[in-house]
């Protein structure tokens, strides 16, 4: 990575503004149901504390629409962060202003102050320069560790970097390193697995990957649109009619550039999406008119597995079927197992693919699980991420 990281700056005794992604799920009692994102930031926070920095930590949570809303307060996060760090975490009553500046000014080395939800201010998402300056006033160095928000040009992810030295935290560094290694310098064969419901969400990714990969495996609801483009009848399956021509063009482009593009040869069909509904596996040329394709079939899973096992680099984004309803999760789990077994450099992104890897119990065998859904998608599209661009070059 050609951007400076926290290793490249002296932080001892300095106030450091750390933008993290603590956008965690809460239940109706406002208890955190999954603290993965908080844990992901711990190495950066621990390192900065050990180096004697004074930490001012900032994050968004949910979509409070630019106003204070207790429902989106970071108080439950402060409590969990304190448990994980094993220290007291001071909770600021606000994001900016004299009281917060006073609390930041009183911090001692190794202490942590968590600001309230940055999205309580409409200026955050507008990347308002005056608001960014107020955030910058709290500290002397800006550390970005929120890869999950790096595709957003907001005040706390990008704007603040105009006023302070800006460097990457360990999580941000790791994300950039693995994603760019896979995309820009892959060991071959390079296999990409793209799934999810809609082609429209993944057009940019497919177009960018066609110039880089050796094999492209397509599953999930989006595969139906490609099958339709090949002239197959898809019954009641989800198809984006307005994208059928585009799917055809992408298949032609793959041929032109010598990429092996594989679609399902068989699918699991059912009359509707619900657990326990009778389902069966059929070839893609025999999808019943009254049923819908909801997962890749066993032959496809086996075929995809063979391609994945040959790979030296694998990038996977999006499930192979309606993963959240059994038995339509089998194709996705089979792919997860193959990726884990391949021994390839593997990068998995997107909520559902990450959940699949965890469900299959193989998370520890994946080289890198990306914490940023939208950000990793834009990275795969070849876009520049504002939250990365603003960091100081080495």
From Swiss-Prot:
The lineage of its organism: Bacteria, Bacillati, Bacillota, Clostridia, Thermoanaerobacterales. InterPro entries: Phosphoglycerate_kinase (IPR001576), Phosphoglycerate_kinase_CS (IPR015911), Phosphoglycerate_kinase_N (IPR015824), Phosphoglycerate_kinase_sf (IPR036043). GO terms for biological process: gluconeogenesis; glycolytic process. GO terms for molecular function: ADP binding; ATP binding; phosphoglycerate kinase activity. It comes from the Bacteria. Substrate binds at residues 21-23, 37, 60-63, 119, 152. It is an enzyme of class 2 (transferase). ATP binds at residues 202, 324, 350-353. The keyword Cytoplasm applies. Its EC number is 2.7.2.3. Belongs to the phosphoglycerate kinase family. Coiled coil: none annotated. Pathway: Carbohydrate degradation; glycolysis; pyruvate from D-glyceraldehyde 3-phosphate: step 2/5. Its main location: cytoplasm. It catalyses: (2R)-3-phosphoglycerate + ATP = (2R)-3-phospho-glyceroyl phosphate + ADP. This is Phosphoglycerate kinase. Keywords: ATP-binding, Cytoplasm, Glycolysis, Kinase, Nucleotide-binding, Transferase. It comes from Carboxydothermus hydrogenoformans (strain ATCC BAA-161 / DSM 6008 / Z-2901). It is found in: Cytoplasm.
């Amino acid at each position: 990575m050609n951007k400076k990281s926290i290793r490249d700056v002296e932080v001892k005794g300095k106030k450091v503004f750390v933008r993290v992604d603590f956008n965690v799920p809460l239940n109706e009692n406002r208890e955190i149901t999954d603290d993965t994102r908080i844990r992901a930031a711990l190495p950066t926070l621990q390192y900065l504390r050990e180096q004697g920095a004074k930490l001012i930590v900032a994050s968004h949570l949910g979509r409070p629409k630019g106003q204070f809303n207790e429902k989106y307060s970071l108080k439950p996060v402060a409590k969990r962060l304190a448990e994980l760090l094993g220290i007291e975490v001071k909770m600021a009553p606000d994001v900016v202003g004299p009281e917060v500046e006073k609390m930041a000014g009183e911090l001692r080395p190794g202490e942590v102050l968590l600001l309230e939800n940055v999205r309580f201010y409409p200026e955050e998402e507008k990347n308002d320069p005056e608001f960014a300056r107020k955030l910058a006033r709290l500290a002397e160095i800006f550390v970005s560790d929120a890869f999950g928000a790096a595709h957003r040009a907001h005040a706390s992810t990008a704007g603040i970097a105009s006023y302070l030295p800006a460097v990457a935290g360990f999580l941000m560094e790791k994300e950039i390193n693995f994603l760019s290694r896979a995309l820009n310098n892959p060991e071959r064969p390079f296999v990409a697995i793209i799934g999810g419901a809609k082609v429209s969400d993944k057009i940019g990714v497919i177009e960018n990957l066609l110039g880089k990969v050796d094999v492209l495996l397509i599953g999930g609801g989006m595969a139906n649109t490609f099958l339709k483009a090949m002239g197959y009848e898809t019954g009641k399956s989800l198809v984006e009619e307005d994208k059928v021509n585009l799917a055809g063009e992408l298949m032609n482009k793959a041929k032109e550039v010598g990429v092996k593009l594989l679609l399902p040869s068989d699918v699991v069909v059912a009359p509707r999406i619900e657990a326990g509904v009778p389902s069966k596996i059929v070839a893609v040329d025999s999808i019943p008119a009254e049923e819908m394709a909801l997962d890749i079939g066993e032959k496809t899973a086996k075929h995809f597995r063979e391609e994945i096992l040959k790979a030296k680099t694998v990038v996977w984004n999006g499930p192979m079927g309606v993963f959240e309803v059994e038995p339509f999760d089998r194709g996705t789990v089979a792919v997860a197992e193959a990726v884990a077994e391949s021994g390839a450099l593997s990068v998995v992104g997107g909520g559902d693919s990450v959940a699949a890897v965890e469900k299959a119990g193989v998370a520890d065998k994946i080289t890198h699980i990306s914490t940023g859904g939208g950000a990793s998608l834009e990275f795969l599209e070849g876009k520049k991420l504002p939250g990365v661009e603003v960091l100081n070059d080495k």
